């Protein structure tokens, strides 16, 4: 099996709505594995949570948008949202080398 390096960046969203978003900084996994990327947030006004994938030197690519609580599945990627807990996660199944990237929640 080949190793896959996944990089997570910490993001803090500021502005009039007072949003804060925190993610882990990095993680390693192997091809074929299942990886869960957690994201916690605090906000005074919630309009939904986005997940993006960003490869080095490229613009972010949209993966999912959650407004309602629960699990949204889209191919090998699933995203979960709990508004009451200020928590979301992105689940990557059957990990592939092309999944080596930064993952952002916003």
Curated annotation (Swiss-Prot):
Disulfide bonds join 39-105. InterPro entries: Ig-like_dom, Ig-like_dom_sf, Ig-like_fold, Ig_V-set, TCR_variable_domain. Gene3D superfamilies: Immunoglobulins. It is found in: Cell membrane. Keywords: Adaptive immunity, Cell membrane, Disulfide bond, Glycoprotein, Immunity, Immunoglobulin domain, Membrane, Receptor, Signal, T cell receptor. The keyword Cell membrane applies. One of its GO terms (cellular component) is T cell receptor complex. It comes from the Eukaryota. Residues 19-106 form the Ig-like domain. Residues 1-18 form the signal peptide. It holds the Pfam family V-set. Glycans are attached at residue 38. The keyword Ion transport does not apply. One of its GO terms (biological process) is adaptive immune response. V region of the variable domain of T cell receptor (TR) alpha chain that participates in the antigen recognition. Alpha-beta T cell receptors are antigen specific receptors which are essential to the immune response and are present on the cell surface of T lymphocytes. Recognize peptide-major histocompatibility (MH) (pMH) complexes that are displayed by antigen presenting cells (APC), a prerequisite for efficient T cell adaptive immunity against pathogens. Alpha-beta TR is a heterodimer composed of an alpha and beta chain; disulfide-linked. The alpha-beta TR is associated with the transmembrane signaling CD3 coreceptor proteins to form the TR-CD3 (TcR or TCR). The assembly of alpha-beta TR heterodimers with CD3 occurs in the endoplasmic reticulum where a single alpha-beta TR heterodimer associates with one CD3D-CD3E heterodimer, one CD3G-CD3E heterodimer and one CD247 homodimer forming a stable octameric structure. CD3D-CD3E and CD3G-CD3E heterodimers preferentially associate with TR alpha and TR beta chains, respectively. This is T cell receptor alpha variable 1-2. The gene is TRAV1-2.
């Amino acid at each position: 099996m080949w190793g896959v390096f996944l990089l997570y960046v910490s993001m803090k969203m500021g502005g009039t709505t007072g949003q804060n978003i925190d993610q882990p900084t990095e993680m390693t996994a192997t091809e074929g594995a299942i990886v869960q990327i957690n994201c916690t947030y605090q906000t005074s006004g919630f309009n939904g949570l986005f997940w993006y994938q960003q490869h080095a030197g490229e613009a972010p690519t949209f993966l999912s948008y959650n407004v309602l609580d629960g699990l949204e599945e889209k191919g090998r990627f699933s995203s979960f949202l709990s508004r009451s807990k200020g928590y979301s996660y992105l689940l990557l199944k059957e990990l592939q080398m092309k999944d080596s990237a930064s993952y952002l929640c916003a």
